[in-house]
Amino acid sequence: MWLLNIHVLQLFLFILIFDPFVREDIDYMEPTLNTPILLYTEQTPNPESLKFVTNKMLYRGTADFRESSFAKDWSPLATALFGFPYVKGVYICNNFVTITKELNFTWEDIMIRLKEFIKKYVDEAGEILKPGFEEEKARVEAEKGIGYQYSGDEEETVNKIKNLIDSYVKPAVEMDGGNIEFKSYDHGIVTVILEGSCSGCPSSTVTLKAGIEGMLKRMIPEVKEVISEMG
């Protein structure tokens, strides 16, 4: 319950402070040859997901791997992590990796081994993502209907929705080791995609309805409902 409250509170803090908000790309300090790689963990609202944070930029973007077969094609790091029997999902963003574990394992038993592995992998400059991943990600998103070109009043509404999600929701969700992406808008229904720790999180429905849907309906009268799909 405490984690759920923190998750919702973080989102409302971004919503209530409604001044113009421009999200700058975070500039992480790139370790030099003499700078040790640091790594620590952060809890997420999803008890099955844990955030592993390092002081090195891993990937300026988002990469969500729910299947080892997709990871094998595009991410050596995710592929290596899927080699552990307790890893169910891998999400890479900026300077952190969110790992979702299988239900029959506890973090107490596996966390230290994962920390040591990720730290060693990053320290040895292991490849995170293969060239061409961005293009493949765009192709997959196009198949899901993401990137559909709206026109007229719908285009204006969709732009407002995207701006609110990118400016107020994404930063809060990212702090919890997850991600949210706009997918579609149809007759007042907004569909978003949840990734990382948000996928399968027990509190995601509360956050979606009490936070995201409430904000969009309040700021954009055309919005009637927000629904989600898992990444």
Indicate where each model-derived feature is located.
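Domain-level signature for proteins that mediate thiol-based redox and metal-cofactor handling
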Residues: 7, 14, 21, 25-231
